Amino acid sequence: MSQREFNKIRSKDMAMIFQDPMTSLNPYLRVSEQMAEVLMLHQGISKSKAVKEAVRLLDAVRIPDAATRVTMYPHEFSGGMRQRIMIAMSLLCQPRLLIADEPTTALDVTVQAQIMQVLADVRQDFGTAVILITHDLGIVAGFCDRTLVMYGGQIMEEGPTDNIFADPAHPYTSGLLKAVPRLDKDEATLATIAGEPPDMSHLPPGCPFSPRCAQILDNCRAQRPARETTGQRRRACHLPVKEVA
């Protein structure tokens, strides 16, 4: 795809929310200028109309007194408010797909919940599909309909979120869930996954998780498992599903 072709779908068909809103926003421009620029470029509307639309979207993501605050600079907002601005900016051209990359990074628990509620409202009110990239299993459980578990840049397991949490079908997924602290169990130490994260420049020829897998088979190191589909679930593992511990 050429850069020109990609520009046609960027913002209009899909948009992205990045991890750090402070570095994603231009510190030298007012919020109104940054948001209006997107609409003027992709929709060809006047600056005054673009600013009005920016105010409407800031109000939609629950920024108080949006008409006044749209004239402020990024440093005048808290981290949570900056993330709301990024969400509003991503909605300017009403994309069909919104990719949120760790949208709650460096936010406290209360603000995290508020941001996730805003994303849930966006999904419902705007009819936008959301791909959430995160390491937070609690957020996955509370927000996602479907989950893809990845390791070493490859999909290990995929399926409805409730099913994956209740019955993991891959040793890596099982290890992740066991490492989550539980309030209903009195455990002296947390479970961990042995070994080190993968070196992406030197992945093994077989399963990328094989160097750390506690249930490794003879062919796991040499042969990459194919993704098999069973109902609404898919997984890539040589180990039979019933033997996953």
Give residue spans per PLM region:
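ABC ATPase NBD coupling module
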Residues: 1-15, 33, 41, 163-168, ...
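ABC-type ATPase nucleotide-binding domains, specifically the catalytic core motifs of the NBD
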Residues: 1-6, 29-49, 59-63, 159
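Hydrophobic anchor residue at the start of the ABC signature
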Residues: 35, 87, 111, 115
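ABC ATPase nucleotide-binding domain helical subdomain, centered on the C-loop/LSGGQ "ABC signature"
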Residues: 44, 48-63, 70-71, 166, ...
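Short catalytic/signature loops enriched in Gly
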Residues: 64-68, 158-245
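Conserved ABC ATPase signature
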Residues: 72-77, 81
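P-loop NTP-binding/switch modules centered on Walker-like glycine-rich loops
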Residues: 94-103, 107-188
